[in-house]
UniProtKB/Swiss-Prot annotation:
One of its GO terms (molecular function) is ATP binding. This is Putative replication origin binding protein. The keyword Nucleotide-binding applies. Belongs to the herpesviridae oribp family. Changing K405E: Complete loss of ATPase and helicase activities. No effect on ssDNA binding. The lineage of its organism: Viruses, Duplodnaviria, Heunggongvirae, Uroviricota, Caudoviricetes. Coiled coil: none annotated. ATP binds at A399, S400, L401, G402, T403, G404, K405, T406. Induction: Expressed in the early phase of the viral replicative cycle. The keyword Zinc does not apply. Residues 386-516 form the Helicase ATP-binding domain. Displays bipolar ssDNA and dsDNA unwinding activities that require the same core catalytic residues for unwinding in either direction, the 3'-5' direction being more robust.
């Protein structure tokens, strides 16, 4: 459906003079005008109001052709896709006035600035149109036949600027809406960027009530239309086949989410800052100086930034009221100030929720998903499913954290409704052990259990995803597979370095998913990407069903967001002084947790213990991890300071408060939310998130989905990670609000606690100095290993030569950590690093931009180039760009890890010897 519009005739007030001026319909020109005054072309008119003069619904290209002839030849009319719902005179171009969901057989594309013309002359519209169709065919030959018919129209700058610049009309076999076309061409553009390096279609064409400017440009002052000068037509029609689109294309808006009135209630749960951030100040200034675009552009941006930065909306509205009132009085008297406030809140909330929420659609890119109902009454928080999931399906169980997903599976097993061999898969060893206990199952890492499973003495097993290849011989014998934490399992399968035999694990997973009678996948973080990754692994050969059990498990909880890390430690110390029980989860690292634990014990007298990679072998810590709440009671613990990786999957119900510090974006926001839920009963949550966490880059645009399932699934997860981490803090806030918590956002620091840096450094030095093969001090399990590494890196004769100074230097330099990171980097970046200097590191930055995907896959860290200097530091390379130390350390690292030293890091003597050996091998090969 095309509505044909002309500008509405009437009076317009000149803002400078206050004089009203009459404007006729023909005064509005919807063609670009080229003249001496505007050699680059004066843009087309943009009236505030229109008259709808005609409506057309062409069913074919043949019917579209006369309409195109009219639209291209009359500069005073313009088109909109959609049927007008309002009175046709004096109508504003907004979504509510037009039904934009009318399906049509006509596909309109705006192709703008593609430099690859296929070798055709810039006036050869037929050749260039066929070249576009050829590119579309290379992306999907089923949808876009090479002999597709088309109408091609030269856009205003065609012939004047390089590249393909045209409006291209195709005819579809089925009727589709603009929203469906936006979804289609979003996917087409993703493939096009990977294949050709550019977008094929301009997606703005498919926005609601977007003006379609078809009028040919106007030329004056001796400037000649280049097409007329060449005697070439600006409009051509070629008959041919139809485009073959699937009849179940989803609408783009359904993939982006919609606004719901219930979103407004989220604002009641937030108490924001009464101070503007820099971004909010900048947008307020833009508002104060604006002549137009305030309602649709500036206000939504202002509210979106305010919500992201935690600024209180009521305070913001008081601040902007004077400027907005003046704008309404002088430039837009058709709306009142509350309309602006409501639109800002609505647009900000829509983006806030839909950029963060993980939803399961009923139709996933054409694949229908069947929603199953749970048996839990609305007032009951815990998950109850009376009937076992259907056989022959892949069934996802999405339920809020702490509602009993694994308990439901345990009940099915106990009831005997999951007969035969049962395999539970998860992503951490701690959860393997936990699931083994819950399901009365054997463990993959116990030989006797594997043997008993093989001979049929037991029929239940628990394993990690990285050990799934061990079950290759059991393919066809597994009756039920249960994947616990399935979203995290898939993430590990795609990216985690711990999965050494990745492709074999993928193949075994695929075969078990195909052959198992019952497939159950459970997680609180399931999204469309989760389902697509698992479903596409088996080409959706099994129907997909899902349960969605959402409960507000934090409805009585209060969260407090702090502006800096030091405030968290002050709040934690205060809670201990008040006699409260507290747990802190932080990515600070073992040494900092140990130092803070020492300070808190000294400052408060509380019993504080640290759980991290260097303490899990300590007896007291091991018992806490194994026996959780009961052991905390027995040890009378006041406070735990924990690393998130060590406590993943370990749940407590003991503490009054949870504290969370997030310095880096190495873990996604949903994993930090799981850290917040480490204690299921805590009602006070204190958190700090460093600003550097936002803007995570996983190089999603650099994956080649034509390579197969692995790259397709990696791209799905990488793109979701980037979206959710675009504003890390905002996403985490949504998770808290969604679970019912209230949030107070503080703008002022609470100060600092008295640290124990000096005392802890002395303790760490003593721990390394006095360590032996049989003894390491508590919380310093790596001390003897550090001592041995120190000897190697500083080229000492033996551990007897280690001095306090050596240990101090080792603690400062961290040579093994630097070399280990350098090992991941040097193949990709060494040549670029060598080009850097103390003046610029641009060569490294540019290289990082081009290898984002590879960097993320190697390191698991953000490939955002803004961290380039930090990554050089992590390689032991300072601002002086001196690489002598890291080369020496890396050579030592290779020897420690029994790896050959790369040729580029060899000494002259080593190179000569290596070349000699290679020469001898070559001679031997020739002789053979």
């Amino acid at each position: 459906m095309f509505s044909i519009l002309q500008g509405h005739a009437g009076f317009s007030r000149d803002l400078a003079t206050g004089i009203w001026r009459e404007i006729k319909a023909e005064d509005y020109t919807f063609a670009k005008r080229f003249s001496k005054e505007h050699p680059e072309g004066k843009p087309a008119s943009m009236p505030f109001k229109f008259d709808v003069i005609e409506e057309h619904d062409p069913q074919s290209l043949a019917e579209m052709l006369p309409l195109m002839r009219r639209l291209t030849s009359d500069p005073h009319i313009v088109a909109v896709r959609g049927r007008c719902l309002a009175p046709k005179n004096n109508v504003r171009r907004k979504k509510g006035n037009f039904n934009v969901s009318n399906p049509s057989n006509i596909i309109a594309m705006d192709v703008d600035g593609i430099l690859d013309t296929g070798g055709y002359d810039k006036f050869n519209l037929v050749g260039m149109a066929r070249h576009i169709i050829k590119m579309l065919n290379s992306i999907s030959e089923d949808m876009f036949p090479l002999d597709a018919g088309f109408i091609a129209h030269a856009s205003s700058s065609a012939g004047l600027k390089p590249g393909i610049r045209m409006h291209l009309m195709l005819e579809s076999n089925v009727k589709v809406t603009q929203g469906q076309l936006k979804f289609l061409f979003t996917s087409i553009n993703d493939s096009s960027k990977q294949k050709f390096g550019f977008d094929i279609a301009d997606l703005a064409y498919y926005s609601s009530v977007q003006l379609h400017y078809f009028a040919d440009p106007l030329f004056s002052d001796g400037i000649v239309d280049p097409f007329k000068a060449e005697s070439k037509p600006r409009l051509v029609y070629v008959k041919g086949s139809k485009v073959n689109l699937p009849n179940n294309l989803v609408d783009y808006e359904t993939t982006r989410g919609e606004f719901k009135e219930e979103f407004y209630s989220l604002l009641d749960q937030i108490k924001g800052k009464k101070i503007a951030s820099d971004k909010v100040e900048e947008t307020i200034s833009e508002l104060e100086e604006a002549d137009d675009g305030v309602y649709l552009r500036i206000i939504p941006k202002l509210y979106h930034r305010a919500l992201e930065d935690g600024v209180d909306f009521a305070w913001l509205e008081r601040e902007i009221k004077p400027a907005l009132s003046e704008y309404i009085a002088t430039k837009d008297n058709s709306r009142n100030i509350q309309d602006y406030f409501n639109n800002g809140r609505k647009q900000a909330l829509k983006a806030f929720v839909n950029n963060s929420k993980r939803e399961i659609p009923l139709n996933l890119k054409g694949v229908p998903l069947k929603k199953l109902e749970v048996d839990s009454p609305p007032e009951v928080p815990y998950l109850k499913i009376n009937i076992v999931p259907p056989k022959g399906h892949i069934t996802f169980v999405k339920a809020s954290l702490g509602t009993g997903k694994t308990t439901a599976v345990t009940k099915w097993l106990d009831a005997g409704v999951l007969p035969g061999n049962f395999l539970a898969v998860t992503n951490t060893r701690a959860l393997v052990s936990s699931n083994a206990k819950k399901f009365s199952a054997g463990q993959y890492d116990k030989s006797v259990d594997m043997l008993n499973f093989k001979r049929g003495a037991i029929d239940r097993m628990s394993t990690t995803i990285h050990s799934l290849h061990k079950f290759k011989s059991f393919i066809g014998q597994i009756d039920t597979i249960f994947i616990d934490e399935c979203d995290a399992v898939m993430n590990d399968l795609l990216f985690a370095p711990v999965v050494k035999q990745r492709r074999e694990c993928i193949q075994v997973l695929r075969d078990i998913l195909m052959t198992a009678k019952t497939v159950i996948l459970s997680d609180g973080d399931i999204s469309a990407e989760t389902i697509e990754a698992y479903g596409s692994l088996i080409d959706f050969d099994k129907p997909v069903a899902f349960y969605n059990h959402h409960r507000k498990m934090l409805s009585k909880a209060h969260a407090y967001e702090f502006p800096d890390e030091s405030s968290i430690w002050v709040a934690l110390q205060t809670s201990l002084e008040m006699g409260e029980k507290s747990i802190l989860v932080s990515d600070c690292g073992p040494d900092e947790l140990n130092e803070k634990g020492m300070a808190l014990r000294r400052n408060t007298g509380a019993l504080v213990k640290e759980i991290h990679s260097n303490s899990t072998s300590d007896v007291d810590i091991r018992r806490i991890l194994d026996y959780t709440t009961n052991e905390l009671i027995d040890q009378q613990i006041d406070c735990l300071l924990c690393s998130p990786s060590v406590t993943s999957g370990v749940d407590f119900n003991y503490f009054d408060n949870v504290f969370v510090i997030t310095r880096t974006s190495n873990q996604a926001p949903n994993m930090r939310f799981q850290a917040i839920r480490r204690d299921r009963g805590a009602q006070n949550i204190y958190y700090f998130i460093d600003k550097s966490t936002s803007g995570f880059s996983a190089g999603s645009e650099q994956y080649n989905i034509d390579e197969g399932w692995l790259e397709l699934a990696q791209q799905l997860y990488a793109r979701r990670r980037e979206l959710e981490s675009r504003n890390y803090t905002s996403t985490l806030r949504y998770y808290l609000l969604d679970q019912g918590a209230t949030i107070d956002i503080f703008s002022e620091s609470w100060g600092t606690i008295e640290g124990a840096g000096k005392e802890y450094t002395e303790e760490r030095i003593k721990a390394i100095l006095h360590s032996t093969p049989d003894y390491c001090a508590p919380r310093h399990a790596d001390a003897y290993e550090a001592k041995l590494l120190l000897v190697r890196y500083y080229h000492l004769e033996s551990i007897k030569d280690v001095t306090v100074e050596h240990v101090e230097q080792y603690i400062k330099d961290k040579p093994n950590d630097r070399a280990a990171f350098f090992h991941k980097m040097h193949e990709m970046f060494w040549e670029d690093i060598k080009k850097c200097s103390n003046v610029t590191i641009k060569p490294f930055i540019e290289a990082l931009k081009g290898k984002k995907k590879d960097f993320f896959l190697k390191t698991g860290q953000s490939a955002n180039p803004k961290y380039a200097r930090m990554y050089l530091g992590m390689m032991g390379i300072g601002k002086d760009m001196n690489t002598e130390n890291i080369v020496d350390w890396y050579r030592t690292y290779c020897k420690i890890e029994c790896m050959p030293i790369p040729f580029k890091f060899m000494t002259e003597e080593e190179r000569a010897m290596a070349e000699e050996v290679m020469s001898e091998l070559g001679a031997t090969n020739e002789d053979a």
